[in-house]
């Protein structure tokens, strides 16, 4: 029994290691539409429609209402006005169903930006954001990956880190740089 516990401690963590195979700058960003919620209200988010207004920051997170994902949502909410000033649309996405995203959009995103539901994992797969293996609770979830997508539909930037710390800072810097280069 002790050996089994040691084996799980050593190798069990490998089940949730990220794939690190995110799309790279210059790659085409797969177009998608998804059910989303902002301020507790449902709507259909279309990447192609959002790109008509400027760059899109699309961030994937493992699960709504978990510690790291809540921290990340709070930080994106605090920076939402800065993203908008730079002309960017901000949207988060996880595999959680729309019923969960409705509450998350109000409670944790503070009505500042939408979160999309991808229970089929189709968008998560298309963006190489699926975590390899399953969580300790047996769920398949996305990795924590942030993308900045240019209006022409290509990836400007991708950032993969299981910690939420730098996702907001890094994507906002890229969006601001894009905005400076595309004034007028």
What are these regions (language model features)?
Residues 5-16:
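Bacterial N-terminal signal peptides
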């Amino acid at each position: 029994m002790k050996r089994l516990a040691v084996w799980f401690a050593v190798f069990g963590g490998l089940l949730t290691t990220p794939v690190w195979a995110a799309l790279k700058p210059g790659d085409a960003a797969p177009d998608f539409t998804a059910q989303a919620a902002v301020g507790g209200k449902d709507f259909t988010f279309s990447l192609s429609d959002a790109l008509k207004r400027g760059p899109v920051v699309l961030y994937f997170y493992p699960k709504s209402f978990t510690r790291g994902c809540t921290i990340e949502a709070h930080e994106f909410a605090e920076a939402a006005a800065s993203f908008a000033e730079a002309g960017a649309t901000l949207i988060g996405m996880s595999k959680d169903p729309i019923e969960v995203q409705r509450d998350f959009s109000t409670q944790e995103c503070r009505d500042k930006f939408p979160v999309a539901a991808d229970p089929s994992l189709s968008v998560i797969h298309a963006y190489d954001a699926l975590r390899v293996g399953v969580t300790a609770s047996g769920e398949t979830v996305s990795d924590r990956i942030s993308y900045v997508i240019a209006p022409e539909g290509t990836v400007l930037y991708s950032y993969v880190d299981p910690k939420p710390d730098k996702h907001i800072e890094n994507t906002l810097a890229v969006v601001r740089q894009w905005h400076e280069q595309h004034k007028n």
